[in-house]
UniProtKB/Swiss-Prot annotation:
Catalytic activities: N(6)-dimethylallyladenosine(37) in tRNA + (sulfur carrier)-SH + AH2 + 2 S-adenosyl-L-methionine = 2-methylsulfanyl-N(6)-dimethylallyladenosine(37) in tRNA + (sulfur carrier)-H + 5'-deoxyadenosine + L-methionine + A + S-adenosyl-L-homocysteine + 2 H(+)
Record-listed [4Fe-4S] cluster 2 binding positions: C204, C208, C211
Gene name as annotated: miaB
Enzyme class: transferase
Name recorded for this polypeptide: tRNA-2-methylthio-N(6)-dimethylallyladenosine synthase
Assembly notes: Monomer.
Statement: the UniProt record of this protein carries the keyword Iron-sulfur: yes
Organism this protein belongs to: Psychrobacter arcticus (strain DSM 17307 / VKM B-2377 / 273-4)
Function: Catalyzes the methylthiolation of N6-(dimethylallyl)adenosine (i(6)A), leading to the formation of 2-methylthio-N6-(dimethylallyl)adenosine (ms(2)i(6)A) at position 37 in tRNAs that read codons beginning with uridine.
Cofactors named for this entry: [4Fe-4S] cluster
Domain TRAM: 425-493
């Protein structure tokens, strides 16, 4: 598998500008759509993926469209690739420079192999556009998140230009926002494994002052209901048991039904729960502004909804939330969580936090610590604030020193780590639902899977019967703490 995955929330966790507490099980199985088999061909494509789950999903679709149109094969080895694709993310500090730094390394490969085709996609491509080819003229294709379905045409155009003017070649750029048409041109989803992402919408219309997403992915556009369900039907028929619904703000889903009426997100959850074969539903990411009562009620009505919610709050201070243009208060957020806990007492929570936002005082930070302690977040994706070009917050004075930001982040992370450890230890002696995914690499007499709360669960099982259990939902009694994100137990029953 050639897709190298970085999460903007967890990439380079040791770097000075970000620390993240994350589950041990990351995108291994969630990469399934990007692991699809493609037609046999001599051309090979290597993809490196930076960023969020949306980018992981998009990278899988890049491979799908090139496999479907040109029979390209995926390669792990960059040195044997005929096509190099970089799916970029603009969330991190100095994202553009990191892209050009990587492109500089790719340039050396192209100097040795002039026929190598290089493409840059994702949010940095959307931001930079023609500037990428001005600074890196050896790049053949530049495309945005909304135009990845046009990769086959861009690839053909790059070859045509090479034939016409091999020494004066001009690359192709398409970073337009053609509504949501890309989903109309994607091939049938193909998957290995028991988990899959399904994108239900693109873009975001919230315009938080720190965020580049509305400028790189456009405003919110929802896929029609039937299109979403057709993709899920296809994945379920291939053995997928867990669906993760994706969007920058899935709560804002407004998909059109075939009768012209609008399907909201809570209703979509009900539709997905009725798809044969789907046993678990996750979604990411959400916005508190639209985490409505009908979504909360779905947790009482749909056992398929896992007992885990990722609901970014960004800060525990109302003053900072106002400066971030989040358009909700801490009391609203806490009330939402309390309603959910009344329905699902075992719900596990995770969130996003930005530490050191412009104007953050000691009291603002203490308010954030108080919130983290009160709600006992299971884990957190936590950033030190850094300016994103083109955002309103970039115009604010960055008046919190880097030293203070680092100290605050370390203090905040200790609170989260303590909570993570406590919650994992609390699992010992309880029973949890687990999606069985594979044989444990280091313990061939054990199977491993993922609990609702994202913990990895390992349990012994008869070696000659392991295949029968893969893809099943089982009940496991937890007997031992292994690590902050891993436990061990004994199987009690097969549930589905």
């Amino acid at each position: 598998m050639s897709v190298t995955v970085f999460n903007p929330r967890i990439d380079d966790a040791a770097a000075s500008d970000i620390t993240a507490v994350t589950p041990a099980v990351t995108a291994l199985n969630e990469l399934s759509s990007a692991q699809a088999p493609v037609k046999s061909a001599t051309k090979k494509v290597f993809v490196t993926t930076q960023g969020c789950q949306m980018n992981v999903y998009d990278s899988g679709k890049m491979l799908d469209v090139l496999g479907d149109s040109h029979g390209m094969e995926v390669t792990h080895d960059i040195d044997e690739a005929d096509v190099l694709l970089m799916n970029t993310c603009s969330i991190r500090e100095k994202a553009q420079e990191k892209v050009f730094s990587e492109l500089g390394r790719w340039r050396k490969l192209k100097e040795k192999r002039p026929d190598l085709v290089i493409g840059v996609g994702g949010c940095v491509a959307s931001q930079e556009g023609d500037n990428i080819q001005k600074r890196a003229p050896y790049v053949d294709m530049v495309f945005g998140p909304q135009t990845l379905h046009r990769l086959p045409e861009l690839y053909d155009q790059s070859h045509q230009q090479r034939e016409i003017a091999p020494k004066n070649r001009i690359g192709t750029v398409d970073v337009s926002f053609p509504s949501i048409e890309k989903f109309d041109f994607l091939p049938e989803p193909r998957v290995e494994g028991f988990k899959a992402f399904v994108s239900i919408m693109e873009g975001c219309s919230k315009y938080c002052s720190f965020c580049v997403v509305p400028y790189t992915r456009g405003e919110e556009l929802s896929r029609p209901l039937d299109d979403v369900l057709a993709e899920i039907d296809s994945l379920a028929a291939q053995g997928v048991r867990e669906i993760n619904l994706l969007g920058q703000n899935v709560n804002g889903y407004r998909g059109e039904k075939d009768d012209g009426n609008i399907c909201r997100f809570a209703e979509l959850l009900h539709y997905v729960s009725h798809v044969d074969g789907v046993e678990r539903i996750r979604y990411t990411t959400s916005h508190p502004l639209e985490f409505t009562d009908d979504i909360i009620d779905a947790y009482a009505q749909l056992p398929e909804l896992v007992s885990h919610l990722h609901l970014p709050v960004q800060s525990g201070s109302n003053t900072i939330l106002a400066a971030m243009k989040r358009n909700h208060t801490i009391d609203v957020y806490i009330n939402q969580i309390n309603k959910l806990k009344a329905i699902r007492p075992d719900i596990h929570l995770s969130s996003d936090f930005i530490i050191g936002f412009p104007g953050e005082t000691d009291q603002d930070f203490q308010d954030t610590l108080t919130l983290a302690k009160e709600l006992n977040f299971d884990h957190s994706y936590s950033f030190i604030y850094s300016k994103r070009p083109g955002t309103p917050a970039a115009e604010l004075p960055d008046d919190v020193s880097f030293k203070t930001k680092k100290e605050r982040l370390a203090e905040f992370q200790k609170v989260i780590i303590d909570s993570t450890l406590a919650k994992t230890h609390e699992m010992v002696g309880t029973t949890t639902r687990v999606l069985v995914e594979q044989v444990a690499n280091r313990h061939p007499d054990c199977l491993i899977g993922t609990a609702d709360n994202t913990r990895t669960v390992m349990f012994p099982y008869a070696v000659d019967k392991m295949d029968e259990l893969l893809g099943k939902i089982v009940s496991v009694r937890i007997t031992d703490f292994v690590s902050p994100h891993m436990v061990k137990g004994e199987i009690e029953a097969v549930l589905a």
